[in-house]
């Protein structure tokens, strides 16, 4: 402290300035090192297989909840389904989904939570399956989420993929249903590899535009939909 007392104001400001610069450079160096370490591992690549055992996932939705909660399911266990929910809930700006069948309540809860957080959610789904018993598409629409569906009754929108923040792809055989998650032999791949993400971005945008009612005309003579 005596050293600082003996310094002039100008000298003290110089020392403080150098300290600030050193701090900023240190933070930048740490950020650079973090990026290098991440880049050395390459883009995210993860594979999930189903069926997945039923465990408690409440902690993914409520950060302040005390555990164990009152539900009868095992706690503190990571499964393919909990990992899938974690990836979905990692969205910060956008979530784009092409989903054939969507009736899983926990996945619907995750999407609604993202919407509540301000994440822009867009959904393209199948014309027929969006109205089957248990479908969560109606709940998404009721919450104000933008949903479009395949216009033609002759084909199905059979994709099952999602894009998180435009950089993370979630894709596989898994329908977003309870049966698929808990009973079926299914697979999901999660990746941030740009060469794989980009084509799915293009496919989503193509289907989103093709499913826009404003771009379609209904031919009354034969009941077919024509652009």
Curated annotation (Swiss-Prot):
Family membership noted in the UniProt record: Belongs to the phospholipase D family. MitoPLD/Zucchini subfamily.
Reactions it catalyzes: a cardiolipin + H2O = a 1,2-diacyl-sn-glycero-3-phospho-(1'-sn-glycerol) + a 1,2-diacyl-sn-glycero-3-phosphate + H(+)
The organism's taxonomic lineage, starting at the top: Eukaryota, Metazoa, Chordata, Craniata, Vertebrata
Subunit structure comment from the entry: Homodimer.
Protein name (database record): Mitochondrial cardiolipin hydrolase
GO molecular function terms listed in the Swiss-Prot or TrEMBL record: cardiolipin hydrolase activity; metal ion binding; protein homodimerization activity; RNA endonuclease activity, producing 5'-phosphomonoesters
Lineage: superkingdom: Eukaryota
Class of enzymatic activity (EC top level): hydrolase
Localization (cell): Mitochondrion outer membrane
Cellular component GO terms, alphabetical: mitochondrial outer membrane; mitochondrion
Protein's organism: Danio rerio
């Amino acid at each position: 402290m005596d050293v600082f007392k003996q310094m002039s104001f100008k000298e003290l400001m110089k020392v403080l300035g150098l300290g600030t610069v050193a701090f900023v450079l240190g933070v930048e160096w740490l950020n650079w090192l973090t990026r290098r370490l991440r880049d050395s591992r390459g883009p995210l690549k993860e594979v999930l297989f189903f069926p997945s055992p039923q465990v408690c996932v409440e902690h993914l939705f409520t950060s302040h909840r005390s555990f164990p909660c009152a539900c009868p399911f095992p706690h503190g266990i990571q499964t393919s389904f909990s990992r899938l929910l974690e990836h979905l809930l990692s969205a910060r700006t956008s979530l784009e989904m092409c989903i054939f069948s969507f009736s899983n309540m926990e996945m619907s809860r995750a999407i609604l939570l993202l919407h509540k957080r301000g994440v822009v959610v867009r959904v393209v789904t199948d014309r027929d399956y969006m109205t089957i018993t248990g479908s969560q598409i109606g709940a998404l629409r009721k919450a104000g989420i933008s949903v479009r569906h395949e216009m033609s009754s002759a084909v199905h929108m059979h994709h099952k993929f999602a894009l998180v923040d435009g950089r993370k792809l979630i894709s596989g055989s898994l329908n977003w249903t309870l049966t698929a998650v808990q009973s079926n032999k299914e697979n999901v791949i999660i990746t941030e590899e740009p060469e794989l993400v980009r084509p799915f971005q293009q496919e989503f945008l193509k289907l989103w535009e093709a499913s826009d009612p404003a771009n379609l005309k209904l031919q009354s003579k034969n009941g077919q939909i024509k652009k």
